């Protein structure tokens, strides 16, 4: 009675003798699970119908080699799906099998990612057993492991408790079965509205045999940086491109699936089957090929070509072109992981973003990080160029400042032209006041006058010119001075030089005045010449010394001329020397004197062109007396004496006095000329 009451409590709608006896036997057989029969299967189905339990049982059987794998059906048969509730969200995301009426099941479209596969319990009319485990024992995933191993409870109570346990827990209390397995994806559940009144799940119509996917078959990943079209680019443009590509691919796959289900005639194909069969036979291990195999390959090749064309055409439209090029195919395949098997065939050098894409980004004023980096690099380059230019200019200025103090205005004079003895060396360079005096040139002229006999011809004089170049270098002082300081120093030096020159001129003028005074005093003691045969009165004894002093003054004046000093008295001395030297011939020829006068006048004219301050009174009245005195007192009554100390003790007196009367020549007088008024006499 206890067993019958127990069975009535748990099986109210299916109380029969067969069920009670079977449950009683199962209760007393210590839970012997190997003795299941068809009656137990009926009891299980009755329990499911009474409790309206409509759930997809799942097995943890992973199709091991010990278990028999189910037959895969590719035929168009009536099947019912377990994802009718989520038909609005697209096809099932899980990797499920759906059993057909004949016991077969079909794969869904997406590949298997999880080892758990849901299946529906078939109808009781087929008398199909539930899936068995490796030992042949029925194993239910929804049953707790402890309930399967309990020996005190009966099979009916364990089955009923498992059914109630399913509604309460919904397989959340089985962590031991999922330790080493990946996470289970969310499977769809059937609603109450999808079941009939008998509790059996509703069958789908024949038109819903093939689910229509709403997402494309292969998706284009954008996770890997090497396969992105523009890494960290414009998100809006990238999203638009991705959505456009997904829409095209989804419509493509949906149309292809419709065409596949509608095809009934397999006689016409886009690709030649003979060519495909020939390619298949290129493998030596393949002996025979059925007629259906090339059809599958032909369709697969057709779909592959069409999908690649759709992907590449998006790139052609993006580049604003109407012709599909090889680069478009390469870029489209490199952006999708499903075509990684073709990665070795693609030239990686041609994978680059197009210019039109960058142009669109610039027109849309979308600033990407790459473009910002590019602008920063350009700014850095321009700044570096400006810095380099500034540094170069600074270095050049420094070098110029260092070189300018070291520059020396070396005015090396030209080699002087050797002139004849009759030419006057009147180098009064008054225009060279601004020249630097870093180079000082000293010229010393030594003039040797030979004693001439009365009948001897004049000999050429020998000139010796000595050039002593003295370079005054003060590099350590000048390098520390700036340009302005140098100019100031130069001006100061020039002023000092001018002052020195003025002092020298004043000294010379004083000397000349003294000399003229001495000569004027001596002239008063000279008597007038007479017609007698007596010679001229002797000159004072200091005249010889006076001649030597005149020669010394001439040498000093020549040295001062080369130092850019204004020595105008040098002309007189040089003229006197020339007259003295040329008039020692002791001849009665007046032409010699005239030639000397012409030479002297030419030289003096050249000097007058360069020296505007010379107050030269050139008496060209065939007179040898070129009194180019720079004194303001140009007296015609002055007498210039030039004495030549020689063995013959010949003296020359040049008289400019107009009242002087020339006397005829005597034996004692060497030569006389009224025009020149020069007298030669000897102290005999």
Swiss-Prot record:
Region described as Disordered: 1-74, 112-238, 414-487, 511-650
UniProt keyword list: Activator, DNA-binding, Nucleus, Transcription, Transcription regulation
Full protein name: Nuclear transcription factor Y subunit gamma
Keyword Transcription listed: yes
CDD domains tied to this protein: HFD_NFYC-like
Biological process (GO), any one: regulation of transcription by RNA polymerase II
Low complexity bias (residue ranges): 21-49, 142-162, 220-238, 424-437, 478-487, 511-522, 529-637
Record carries keyword Isomerase: no
Ranges of Basic residues composition bias in the record: 163-176
GO MF term list: DNA binding; DNA-binding transcription activator activity, RNA polymerase II-specific; protein heterodimerization activity
Chain's role: Stimulates the transcription of various genes by recognizing and binding to a CCAAT motif in promoters.
Polar residues bias locations: 58-74, 188-203, 414-423, 438-456, 464-477
Pfam families for this protein: CBFD_NFYB_HMF (PF00808)
Organism: Dictyostelium discoideum (Social amoeba)
Main localization category: nucleus
Listed InterPro entries: CBFA_NFYB_domain, Histone-fold, Transcr_DNA_Rep_Reg
Domain of life: Eukaryota
Name of the gene: nfyc-1
Family statement: Belongs to the NFYC/HAP5 subunit family.
Cellular component terms (Gene Ontology): CCAAT-binding factor complex; nucleus
Assembly and oligomerization: Heterotrimeric transcription factor composed of three components, NF-YA, NF-YB and NF-YC. NF-YB and NF-YC must interact and dimerize for NF-YA association and DNA binding.
Localization per record: Nucleus
């Amino acid at each position: 009675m206890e067993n019958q009451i127990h069975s009535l409590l748990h099986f109210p709608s299916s109380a029969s003798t067969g069920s009670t006896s079977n449950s009683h036997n199962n209760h007393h057989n210590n839970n012997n699970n190997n003795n299941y029969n068809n009656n137990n299967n009926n009891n299980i189905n009755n329990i499911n119908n009474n409790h309206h339990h409509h759930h997809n049982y799942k097995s943890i059987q992973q199709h091991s080699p010990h278990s028999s794998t189910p037959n895969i059906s590719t035929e168009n048969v009536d099947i019912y799906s377990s994802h009718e509730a989520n038909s609005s969200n697209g096809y099932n995301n899980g990797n499920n099998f759906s059993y057909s009426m004949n016991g077969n099941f079909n794969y869904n479209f997406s590949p298997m990612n999880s080892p758990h596969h849901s299946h529906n319990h078939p109808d009781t009319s087929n008398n199909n057993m539930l899936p068995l485990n490796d030992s042949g024992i029925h194993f239910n995933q929804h049953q707790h492991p402890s309930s399967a191993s309990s020996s005190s409870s009966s099979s009916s109570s364990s089955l009923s408790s498992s059914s109630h346990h399913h509604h309460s827990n919904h397989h959340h209390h089985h962590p031991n079965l999922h330790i080493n397995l990946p996470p289970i994806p969310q499977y769809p559940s059937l609603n109450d509205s999808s079941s009939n009144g008998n509790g059996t799940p509703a069958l789908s119509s024949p038109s819903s045999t093939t689910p229509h996917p709403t997402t494309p078959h292969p998706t284009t990943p954008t996770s890997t940086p090497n396969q992105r079209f523009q890494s960290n680019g414009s998100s809006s443009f990238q999203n638009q491109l991705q959505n456009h590509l997904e829409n095209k691919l989804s419509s493509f796959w949906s149309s292809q699936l419709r065409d596949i289900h509608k095809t009934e005639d397999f006689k016409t194909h886009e690709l030649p089957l003979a060519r495909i069969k020939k390619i298949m036979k290129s493998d030596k291990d393949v002996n025979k090929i059925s007629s259906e195999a090339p059809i599958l390959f032909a369709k697969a090749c057709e779909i592959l070509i069409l999908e690649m064309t759709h992907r590449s055409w998006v790139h052609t439209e993006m580049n604003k072109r109407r012709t599909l090029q090889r680069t478009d195919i390469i870029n489209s395949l490199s952006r999708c992981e499903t075509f990684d098997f073709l990665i070795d065939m693609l030239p990686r050098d041609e994978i680059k973003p197009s210019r039109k894409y960058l142009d669109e980004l610039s027109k849309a004023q979308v600033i990407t990080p790459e473009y910002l980096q590019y602008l920063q690099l350009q700014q850095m380059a321009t700044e570096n160029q400006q810095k380099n230019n500034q540094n170069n200019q600074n270095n050049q200025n420094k070098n110029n400042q260092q070189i300018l103090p070291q520059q020396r205005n070396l005015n090396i004079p030209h080699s002087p032209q050797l002139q004849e003895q009759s030419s006057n060396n009147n180098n009064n360079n008054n225009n060279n006041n601004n020249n630097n005096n870093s180079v000082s040139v000293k010229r010393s002229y030594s003039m040797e006058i030979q004693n001439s006999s009365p009948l001897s011809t004049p000999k050429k004089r020998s000139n010796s010119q000595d050039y002593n170049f003295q370079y005054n270098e003060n590099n350590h002082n000048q390098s520390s001075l700036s340009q302005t300081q140098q100019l100031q120093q130069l001006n100061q030096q020039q002023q000092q030089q001018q002052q020195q020159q003025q002092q020298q001129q004043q000294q010379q003028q004083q000397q000349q005045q003294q000399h003229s005074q001495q000569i004027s005093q001596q002239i008063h003691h000279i008597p007038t010449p007479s017609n007698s045969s007596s010679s001229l009165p002797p000159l004072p004894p200091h005249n010889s010394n006076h001649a030597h002093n005149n020669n010394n003054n001439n040498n000093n004046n020549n040295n001062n001329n080369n130092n850019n000093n204004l020595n105008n008295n040098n002309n007189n001395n040089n003229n006197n020397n020339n007259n003295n030297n040329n008039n020692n011939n002791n001849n009665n020829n007046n032409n010699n004197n005239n030639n000397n006068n012409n030479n002297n006048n030419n030289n003096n004219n050249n000097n007058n062109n360069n020296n505007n301050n010379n107050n030269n009174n050139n008496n060209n009245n065939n007179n040898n007396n070129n009194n180019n005195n720079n004194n303001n007192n140009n007296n015609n009554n002055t007498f210039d004496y030039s004495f030549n100390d020689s063995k013959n003790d010949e003296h020359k007196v040049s008289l400019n006095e107009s009242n002087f009367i020339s006397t005829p020549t005597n034996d004692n007088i060497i030569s006389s000329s009224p025009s020149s008024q020069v007298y030669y006499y000897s102290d005999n």
